[in-house]
Design a protein with these regions (language model features):
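Core, highly hydrophobic multi-pass alpha-helical transmembrane subunits of bioenergetic inner membranes
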Residues: 1-261
C-alpha cells in the first residue's frame, strides 16, 4: 500500500527478516559445535535454510520492484545507501581480522615460542593456489565489469555471457579454496595462527558464496528480461559487492599469504 503524503512504499508484514535473524544465530551456534564436536549436519541444515529464506525474500523483493513497480527513485536511492552501509560494516569486520593477525604476528606470544608462524606449521606457497585464486578473482572482476558495460549498451547476450563467466570463475575459486584447506597441515585450533587464518579466509569464502548466489539470481533475472539498460539496480549492487570481495582478497593475499610467508 502507499500513503499519499510520502513517496515511500510501505511494506506488508514479512516473515523473512525474523526467520533470517533466528537462522543466522543458529548458524553461528552450529559453527561453534563444529569446532568442538566435529559435527556439521546441523550447520548444513542451517545453511540450506539460509539459502531458502534468501531466495523467498528475493522473490518478494523482485515481485514488489519488477512486477508491482513499487520501487521508485527514492526507494532505489535508499537501497543503494543501505548497500553502501552494509559494505562499510563488512569492511570494519575484516579490519578487525587484519588487526588481530598483524598484532599477533608482529608481537608473537611466548605461548607460541615467540615465532610467527609457530613451529611445525608449514604454510602455503603464495605462488601456488593463492596466486591462482588471486588471478581468478581479478579476472572475475574484469568479466563482471564487461557484463555491466554491455548491459548499459543494451547488449544482453554479451552481458549474460560475461556474467556466466564470472559465476564459473567464482565457483572455481571456491573449489580451489576448499582444496587448499584440505591440503593444510594445521587446523582452526592450532594456536592463534590457525584461528586467525581460518577466520579471515573462511569469512571471505562465505562472502564469495553469498556473492555467487547474488550473481546467479541476477543471471536468472537477466534471462527473464527483468533488466533494462536504464533500470538494473539489483545487478549494479551485486557488482559493488563483488568488487568489494575482490579488494578484500587482495589484502588477504598480500597479508596472510605473501607477507606472512
Amino acid at each position: 500500500m502507499m500513503k499519499f503524503n510520502q513517496p515511500y512504499y510501505i511494506l506488508n508484514i514479512s516473515p523473512w527478516p525474523i526467520l533470517m535473524a533466528f537462522n543466522s544465530f543458529n548458524f553461528m551456534i552450529s559453527n561453534i559445535m563444529i569446532m568442538n564436536f566435529k559435527f556439521n549436519m546441523i550447520s548444513m541444515m542451517n545453511l540450506m535454510l539460509m539459502i531458502i529464506i534468501s531466495i523467498l525474500w528475493w522473490r518478494d523483493i523482485i515481485r514488489e520492484s519488477t512486477f508491482q513497480g513499487n520501487h521508485n527513485f527514492y526507494i532505489m536511492n535508499l537501497i543503494k545507501l543501505s548497500m553502501i552501509l552494509f559494505i562499510i560494516s563488512e569492511l570494519f569486520l575484516f579490519i578487525s581480522f587484519f588487526w588481530n593477525f598483524l598484532h599477533n604476528s608482529l608481537a608473537p606470544s611466548i605461548d607460541i615460542g615467540l615465532n610467527w608462524p609457530p613451529k611445525n606449521i608449514n604454510f602455503f606457497n603464495p605462488l601456488m593456489i593463492p596466486l591462482l585464486n588471486t588471478i581468478i578473482l581479478l579476472t572475475s572482476s574484469f568479466t563482471i565489469t564487461l557484463s555491466h558495460f554491455y548491459t548499459l549498451n543494451n547488449l544482453k547476450k554479451k552481458s549474460s555471457m560475461f556474467l556466466n563467466m564470472t559465476i564459473i570463475l567464482s565457483i572455481y575459486f571456491l573449489y580451489l579454496q576448499t582444496l587448499e584447506y584440505k591440503q593444510a597441515n594445521f587446523t582452526f585450533s592450532d594456536s592463534i595462527f590457525g584461528s586467525s587464518f581460518y577466520m579471515a579466509t573462511g569469512f571471505h569464502g562465505m562472502h564469495v558464496i553469498i556473492g555467487t548466489i547474488f550473481l546467479i539470481i541476477n543471471m536468472m533475472r537477466m534471462i527473464n528480461m527483468h533488466f533494462s539498460f536504464m533500470h538494473h539496480i539489483s545487478f549494479e549492487l551485486s557488482i559493488w559487492y563483488w568488487h568489494f570481495i575482490d579488494i578484500i582478497w587482495l589484502f588477504l593475499y598480500m597479508t596472510f599469504y605473501w607477507w606472512n610467508n
